[in-house]
Amino acid sequence: MTIQQIRITGTGSELQGVGRADDGRAVFVPGALPGECVEVEIIRQAPRFCEGRVVRVLEASDARREPDCPCYGRCGGCHARHMQYAETLKLKRQRVYDALTRIGGLTEPVVRETLGCAQPDRTRNKAEFPIVHGKIGAYAAGSHALVPLEDCLLQREPAVRALRWFAKKLPSLSCASHLTALVTRVNRAGEMMLTVCADAPVASEIEKLLPELRRDLPELVSVYFLRQNRRPSHALDGACSHLWGAKALDETLHHLKFELSPQSFFQVNPDQAERLYDCALEAAGLTESSDARVLDAYCGVGTITLAAAQRAAHVIGVEIVPPAIADARENARRNGLSNRARFILGDAAAEIPKLIAHGEHFDAAILDPPRKGADEKLLDALIRAGIPTLSYVSCDPATLARDVKRLIAGGYLLQWAQPVDMFPWTGHVETVCLLSKLNVKHHIEVEITMDELDLTAAESKATYDEIKAYVLEKFGFKVSQLYIAQIKRKCGIIERKNYNQSKKEDAKVPKCPPEKEAAIMDALKHFQMIP
């Protein structure tokens, strides 16, 4: 046994502590926090790094707390229940910042504060509980060893009740050895769909349970059986058969209606997904209705495409997976957006040049690629197309930074990055980036002072968009640029001449309502523009 004292100086991709071992190698220590001094047992060694286990915390961080889950440290579902939630948001922002500087090569990129959950527990609408040798629970971190569960703080209450029901029932089931997983979906209305997965044709045995299930789980509206393929890649890899109730689960997202089957892809945290989509639309310049034409280069089943179509004149979604395009077209029909959203089956890298050649133009493009990032050919196609605004949605900071670097080399500027916490208590972070095309024919680098711009020190501290975003996040309503300008003038913050004023001498200018004035004043104080 090798025990060392380690000073933790950073965090890894799963929010594990990172420090230096005695020989200088990086050591990853789950459960340790930046700034802490911990006694660590080295449990795994590699040529360039090692992994350790906390034996004792010698100097604790102020952000440390007692984990609130009895399975934490054994179950692999959470990485960060030993720290305050606010600390996880700071570390996720830092992870995005570090990726953009170290991998993207940027100097002081604008990375906003992470948008966290109002309530970080019970956020997920889908659960996959593995069943192994007749017992149900979750997999241990990094293995397929089962950890029995009676609760999961990530999941909604109906899913937990289903978990407990099967935990009690499994010992008496003759088919228990063939069952492999229980998958639950719970919509915003609290209704639940159950899918029982097995490696043998035991659907008739599950059908016998329906009267008890319906009696004991009042939220239940749909039950499916899934016979898994011989070597399944995931729990739902197989053929579904409907046993009882509704064939689809109704759900809403961004004022859109969707019907979900057991195998449908859908965001697992709809509240945060809406905030993510709002950021993506903001980056695409779609904060309100416009005549913009937008491209969605990885449209999937069309959730972001249709959210954009609510505000843009026309959106074209491109996706290479045939079932996803079929679902996207049906979702557009269901929401009455078929006339504003068109979907193309194909590789976006090949389809973009075709669209441009046929006279199509785009004011903005939205990219939401898989974890591996965007295809190089797609990025090159976007660069050649010269689309002025890119809204890049990423689930991996490293591949995001790599792609941003390529886009910058192609003439784009990174304006800002907005981390969003879609998966509380884990190391995962979603990020939205706004990249704008720099027309080199019309731009040169110059150095000017605030005096030359007639810009006051107070005015320079926050942009109108930052003030708008602050008010929307804190108060839940939007404020116009005109109202902000009125309140800034009222506070003595000098605006540039005629800024935001009508050119008509007799124009009637709407006055900022009291509640919006109070919100704007709060924002000005937050940004230290007024005392």
Regions found by a protein language model. Give the residues of each.
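Short, acidic/hydrophobic/Gly-rich beta-strand patch recurrent on exposed beta strands
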Residues: G17-D22, G137-G142, A328
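Extended interfacial segments that mediate partner engagement and assembly in macromolecular machines
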Residues: V55-P67, G73-S177, A203
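Phospho-regulated, low-complexity intrinsically disordered regions of nuclear gene-regulatory
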Residues: K461, V509-P531
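Rossmann-like S-adenosyl-L-methionine
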Residues: T2-R7, S13, P201-T456, Y464
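Short Lys/Arg-enriched helix C-cap and helix-to-coil transition segments
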Residues: E495-E505
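DNA-recognition alpha helix
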Residues: T463-F475, A485-C491
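Terminal RNA-binding accessory module
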Residues: M1-C71, N339-R342, A350
